[in-house]
């Protein structure tokens, strides 16, 4: 199914009362056989399993990395799109770091978002910047 873009699900007040609902509108449908989706999902799972940013990360995440070069005088843009958990997705994300050198850096941000969402690490560690492995996966060239 293809839906209209919506960055928000809903807006509520501090008591949980609905202020505005952003239920996405169905725009079109696509018929893609399940076995083809299975191949795509398996590939996206392998991307994450073989990405340095997700080493020793036991939560099932699927995604795709990418870099986009603008000019040779500036670092490439780092990109990561993904969803979690892999087998029953609850969240989807897209991370773009302008001039971020590498997709691994964008994937590391996604890992921190997932860690925060699913309480996989102390939230104070994310806020203070100590949640990742000391920057060992950060790439600068």
For each feature predicted by the language model, list its residue ranges.
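Active-site beta-strand/loop architecture of penicillin-binding DD-peptidases
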Residues: 1-29, 35, 41-124
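Short, highly charged C-terminal tails/helix-capping segments
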Residues: 124-141
């Amino acid at each position: 199914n293809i839906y209209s873009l919506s960055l928000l699900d809903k807006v509520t007040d501090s008591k949980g009362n609905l202020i505005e609902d952003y239920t996405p509108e169905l725009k079109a449908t696509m018929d893609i056989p399940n076995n083809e989706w299975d191949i795509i999902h398996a590939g996206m799972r392998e991307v994450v399993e073989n990405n340095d940013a997700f080493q020793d990360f036991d939560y099932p995440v699927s995604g795709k990395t990418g870099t986009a070069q603008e000019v040779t005088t500036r670092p490439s843009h780092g990109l990561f799109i993904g969803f979690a958990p892999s087998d029953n997705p609850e969240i989807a994300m897209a991370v773009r770091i302008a001039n971020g050198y590498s997709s691994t850096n964008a994937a590391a941000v996604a890992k921190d978002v997932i860690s925060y969402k699913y309480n996989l690490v102390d939230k104070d560690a994310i806020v203070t910047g100590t949640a990742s492995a000391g920057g060992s996966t950060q790439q600068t060239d």
